[in-house]
């Protein structure tokens, strides 16, 4: 909670708005839209991969949430406050972070499959910003975000490694 309290102490309305917007890039609809666009415009196989990653990641994430049942930071510590605009979407359990897992799976998958360096760097920037936004907004702990990042990272590596072996 120390990191969350440190971030709480430096919040400003400007950064609240920025990270409230950035965090939406970790929603399920983003991986679905990205998968459809990639399917139509780039590669059917890559589109299928992205859709598979998103759906499998969502199932794994919800399973872990129900298994561990860890409450949100402000539930654990009533003195802690979150950015209010984030409260409406921060429902259910805290661990692991669904937004982080979606962002790493989606943008990590795109980064792993693209040949364009600028696309790769943009994807890495987005997945890092979404992950940080969950901490800044106060809706997840570093453990929630770190485990989600690792789970999605492993999924990206396994899926794209299995393809290389084919």
What are these regions, as identified by a protein language model?
Residues 108-112, 152-159:
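Hydrophobic transmembrane alpha-helices
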Residues 73-76, 129-153:
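Interfacial helix-loop-helix junctions of multi-pass membrane proteins
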Residues 1-94, 100-130:
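Hydrophobic alpha-helical bundle signature of multipass membrane enzymes
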Residues 160-166:
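Conserved small/polar residues in nucleotide/adenosyl-binding loops
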Residues 62-69, 133-140, 155-159:
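Juxtamembrane membrane-interface segments at transmembrane alpha-helix termini
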């Amino acid at each position: 909670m120390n990191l969350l309290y440190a971030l709480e102490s430096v919040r400003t309305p400007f950064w609240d708005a920025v990270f409230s917007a950035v965090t939406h890039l970790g929603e399920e609809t983003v991986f679905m839209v990205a998968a459809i666009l990639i399917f139509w415009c780039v590669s059917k196989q890559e589109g299928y991969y992205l859709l598979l990653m998103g759906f499998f990641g969502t199932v794994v994430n919800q399973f872990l949430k129900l298994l561990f049942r860890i409450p949100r930071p402000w539930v654990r510590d009533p003195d802690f406050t979150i950015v209010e605009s984030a409260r409406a979407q921060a429902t259910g359990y805290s661990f692991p972070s669904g937004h982080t897992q979606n962002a790493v799976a989606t943008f990590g998958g795109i980064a792993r499959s693209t040949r364009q360096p600028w696309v790769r760097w943009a994807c890495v920037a987005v997945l890092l910003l979404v992950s940080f936004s969950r901490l800044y907004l106060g809706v997840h702990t570093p453990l929630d975000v770190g485990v989600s990042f690792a789970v999605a990272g492993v999924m990206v590596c396994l899926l794209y490694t299995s393809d290389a072996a084919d």
